């Protein structure tokens, strides 16, 4: 699916693109009491870009200019902007990892 076609509340969404931004990771306290790292990246295709929340060990694998594919995610709105989220069943595939940071 093209990024420009994404809408709030979509489920089971697959997108692909290039990572154009990787934010600082931060610790988030979960309802279970555990703490998990999360960061926001931006993924861009030829139709647009979207923020994506990346959790845990996936953070270390993502670099700027990496070509990735995200599967089984969902779209929600946060601060009047849609964003892509990888849920429990979501998958991240790195198709091409750039050495550029």
Predicted regions and their residues:
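Beta-strand secondary-structure signal
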Residues: 14-18, 40-42, 51, 69-71
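OB-fold (S1/OB) nucleic-acid-binding surfaces
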Residues: 24-52
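Short, charged beta-turn/beta-strand-edge "cap" motif at the junction between a beta-strand
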Residues: 73-78
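OB-fold nucleic-acid-binding modules
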Residues: 1-32, 58-61, 79-101
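Generic beta-strand structural signal
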Residues: 39, 50, 66-68, 80-84
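Short nucleic-acid-contacting surface segments enriched for D/E, G, S/T with interspersed K/R
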Residues: 56-71
């Amino acid at each position: 699916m093209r990024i420009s076609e994404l809408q709030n509340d979509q489920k089971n969404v697959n997108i692909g693109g290039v990572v154009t931004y990787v934010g600082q990771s931060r610790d988030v306290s979960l309802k279970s009491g555990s703490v998990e790292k999360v960061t926001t990246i931006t993924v861009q295709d030829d139709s647009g870009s979207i923020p994506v929340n990346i959790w845990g060990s996936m953070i270390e694998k993502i670099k700027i200019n990496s070509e990735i594919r995200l599967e089984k995610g969902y779209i929600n709105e946060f601060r009047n902007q849609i964003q892509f989220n990888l849920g429990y069943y979501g998958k991240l595939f790195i198709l091409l990892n750039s050495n550029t940071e």
